[in-house]
Structure formats: structure tokens, C-alpha cells
Amino acid sequence: MNILTGTQRTSREKKKVKKLNLLVLLGVFCGVGAVGDADVKVSDALSQSILSEPRIRVLLLSESTTALVEAKGAFSVFGDGELLRVSSQGQRCAAHALYGGIRWGENYPNVECLKIEPLDGSASLFVNGIQYKGSVYIHKTERNCLFVVNELAIEDYLKSVLSVKYLKELDKEALSACVILERTALYERLLAGNANSFWHVNAQEDRYGGYGVTSQFYGVEEAVDWTSRLVLDNPEGLVFNADYLLQSNVDRLAIEGYNARQILEKFYKDADLVVIESWEDNNRGV
């Protein structure tokens, strides 16, 4: 039962919640990443071990005839999972689907999917003029069109989509509480998604604008970093809703001295604050 709205999950949804619990609590059962009973603020820097950075794949373009893809800095190119090229210099070219492969600067015959990956942190990728973190996949369809997908760290994705949602100042503890709920809801969506689809979410539907929109000066980037990989878990399968916190004047609680954990406990009394140690989507490999 959702204690906020009174809605009940279906048995199918509860099974998905159990799957989320198993993935999220892996590190907690091993004694890694559990949040103790001490009165610690989420905004305090947390040192959290990590096995693999959880990543998300975002559909940028669907059934497009071309896409302008630019790599600024050193990059590598993979074709259907095999390393094809390494370049120390950038490249800016239109990508096209060929009858026998994909073209981006040069022809890649018999390739159905190109992956362009920066080689270091100073390199960056652009698709149709928009900057993105992570890697870019270019898929060729049966109709000789392109799907373009951005793969990046979930934490970086949250910084982007939440920067265009939270456009007014909130106390850092109130904002941190909202970010934890937003992250929890995102993981629920990922686990409930179509296992046969290469991408997880749609950029247009999620208002994902890439890396450039993250610097909005409202504290979202800091709140995501402060709460890195923290989610709420509850065996009863609650529906977590950050919008409800905003409607409930969560900023007032923070001003009164509540930290992020205490704020969440007021709304979700039986939920636990846990850290995602790793998350892998084995159904969407290339």
C-alpha cells in the first residue's frame, strides 16, 4: 500500500519490487554502504565503494535518416562490440545508414551498431549540436534509418533531467530528500522496462537535454553528488513520489532543522535508506 496516495500495487509490480530489493541490498547484506542510526546529514560527503558505475541508455533519435555526430578529443569506435578504430584527434561527421553497414567519417561495412566512446575525461561527444556525457551508439535499422542512443552514468543522467525540473531554490536537505526519491523512482522504471529494448528511456519523454543543461545554479548537481546511489527500499513496495514532498512544503521541514533522512522518515516510516553497490542490465548488451 502506498501510504501517500493509498494506491495498491499489483502482484506483478510487487515481484518487480522484490527484484529491485535483491539488486539494491546486495551491498547492504555484505556490510557495505548501509546508513547507520547516527544523525548524519546526507549533505555530508559519503565515501561509498562501488563495483561498477550504474549506467542508463537514452534514446536520442528514432528512425532518423542522418545525425551529426562529433567527438571532441580522443575517441574509440566499436562495431558490433569489436574495437575498429582508435583516434587521438576529434571528428565531426554526419552518420548515415548504408545498405551494407554504417558511415561516420568512413564506411563501416557489415556493421549494425557503432559505439563511439571518449578515451578520457577531457573528451566529449555531441549529437546534432548537443553535448552528452558517456558513449553514443548508432544503430542501423532494417529500413536503413538510424537510432541514436546515449549511454551514461545514472548519476549524470539525474543531474541533467532534475536540473530542468527543480528550477527554484530549495534547502540542500530538502533537495537531497527529493533527489533520493527521484533516483528510487528511476530505478523502479528501469527494472519495470522492456527487457528486449536496447534503450531504457526516451530523451524527449524525460526532457533529457544532455550535459549542457546541468549548470542551473539551484544545487541539483551537488545534491546528486551528496546522495550518490542512495535509494529508499521498502518490502511493502511503496510508490515513491518526490512531487508529493514538494507539494507538502518539504522546504519548511529542512528550515526547521530536519536533515534529508529525517524528512524521508516522516513520509516513509518503514523505508530504509540503502546504497546501490552495482546494477547491471544484462538484457541489453550489444
Swiss-Prot record:
Q: What is this protein called?
A: Uncharacterized protein TC_0311
Q: Which InterPro entries match?
A: SpoIID/LytB_N
Q: Which organism is it from?
A: Chlamydia muridarum (strain MoPn / Nigg)
**Family, per entry:** Belongs to the chlamydial CPn_0389/CT_041/TC_0311 family.
Q: List the Pfam families.
A: SpoIID
